[in-house]
Amino acid sequence: MRTSEWDVNPQRRKFLIAGLAATAAGACFGRAPQIESMDSFILREMKKTNIPGLAAGFAENGVARWVRGYGFADVQTRRPVSTDTMFHIASLTKIVTATMVMRLVEQQRIRLDDPVAPHLDFALANPSHADVPITFRHLLMHVSSISDEEYYKHDSRQSGTDATQPIGDFLKSFLLPGQQYCTSRACFSSESPGTTWSYSNLGYALLGYLASRIGGEDMREQTRKQIFAPLRMRHTSWTIRDTPEALRATPYDMVDGKLQPVPSVGFPDWSVGMLRSSVADFTQFVAACANGGSAAGHRILDETTQRQMLEMHTPKGLPDWLTGQGLGWMAAKLDGITRPEHWGGDPGVFTAVYMNPEKRSAAVVFTNASVTPESKAVIKNIASRLLGSTKPGSG
């Protein structure tokens, strides 16, 4: 992923969406008028910022209760968004990566406070604090002291296709002294590992590489076998190649006031943000996250492990839009209430997940448009409605 999910394009969207259509599948709450009310609410919110396509889902007690698609997956062909449309979910990928790492903890392959360096095939240490090891917990919580300063300067993406550079080679180019992009000043902060929050894509790339080495096979294959298959996530893919064209949500950005498609891109740090998934699939995944690790009759994490992921901390440097950082999951205010959450953003996509652990419920929202301040507000409005005291489709 090249852009942080916190980045916002200030250009206001002027694209007028005509004939926004809602398509529905899966389980729904309540009577038809209630469903129509939710449809009308979401369509109104979309029109505020001219979002071409959106998918939303609600999970409760380990079940995806409500999933629905709105608008267009592809504007030119007027192909509608369905609940099986596969969106690039960007940094929501990190929640899946974190979940797989926690499975390795449960399997006793690693411990959270183990140093990661012994599991690597290259040396890893912050040169300013060489005696302080970087641990799995540090990476999961964005307190590893690994900096993204150089990461954002060098574009490793490949347009229209999956990246060919292996993730290990990519990481060494940034983290191994003497390699292409590695300088001690740019690739590591002056802070000691474990002390200061700084969002790190490189840290999550490292987690994907570590999980592959420790788990005995590519982490992507581990997630297919241990997470996606048990949860029946049939429309989720780590690659562009494995995302059927008929199911792809075309990403869009505004250029000179006109909606323009953005080419799909592949990048070598796949564990950071390469996942494509449908709202039906991902709502099933977050159903498990909100329900103590269990959904669809399958357990992907023990309840104590899932609860541990949602324990929030406030390290130095935590930005004011967050109220806490957990293991993969973050926390922020939604309508004045602190909720576990994560956002994802890349050119042409903006995604979000919010959770209410007390009610074992969660909301998912995917869009195929670059983020703006206005679309951020829309996503929050929809998530708030989904997690509110009334269920989707009511009021």
Describe the residue ranges of each PLM region.
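A short, polar/charged loop-to-alpha-helix boundary motif
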Residues: D74-V81, E374-K380
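Catalytic-site signature segments of enzymes, centered on catalytic residues
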Residues: G69, D84, D131-I134, E150-E245, ...
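Active/ligand-binding-proximal structured segments within catalytic/core domains
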Residues: T97
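A generic structural signal for nonpolar/aromatic side chains embedded in well-ordered alpha-helices
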Residues: L139-L140, F174-L175, C182-S184, C289, ...
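Solvent-exposed loop/turn segments at secondary-structure junctions
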Residues: I146-S147, Y204, A369-T372
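N-terminal secretory signal peptides
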Residues: M1-K14, A18-T23
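Catalytic loop of the DD-peptidase/beta-lactamase superfamily, centered on the K-T-G motif
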Residues: C28-G69, Y151, R157-G160, T195, ...
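Active-site helix/loop module of the DD-peptidase/beta-lactamase fold
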Residues: S37, G53, T83, H88-L92, ...
